[in-house]
Amino acid sequence: AYPGNGVHCGKYSCTVDKQTAIGNIGNNAA
């Protein structure tokens, strides 16, 4: 999980960090 980012994309899929997802969707591309 990365602070301030709700969605984290890996090689094959994206995961959601529920603790930081609110208001921070799609900010992390790596």
Curated annotation (Swiss-Prot):
One of its GO terms (biological process) is defense response to Gram-positive bacterium. It is found in: Secreted. It comes from the Bacteria. Stable below 60 degrees Celsius. Activity decreases sharply at temperatures above 60 degrees Celsius. InterPro entries: Bacteriocin_IIa_dom_sf. Keywords: Antibiotic, Antimicrobial, Bacteriocin, Disulfide bond, Secreted. GO terms for cellular component: extracellular region. Disulfide bonds join 9-14. Stable below pH 6. Its main location: secreted. Has antibacterial activity against the Gram-positive bacterium L.monocytogenes. Belongs to the bacteriocin class IIA/YGNGV family. This is Bacteriocin curvaticin.
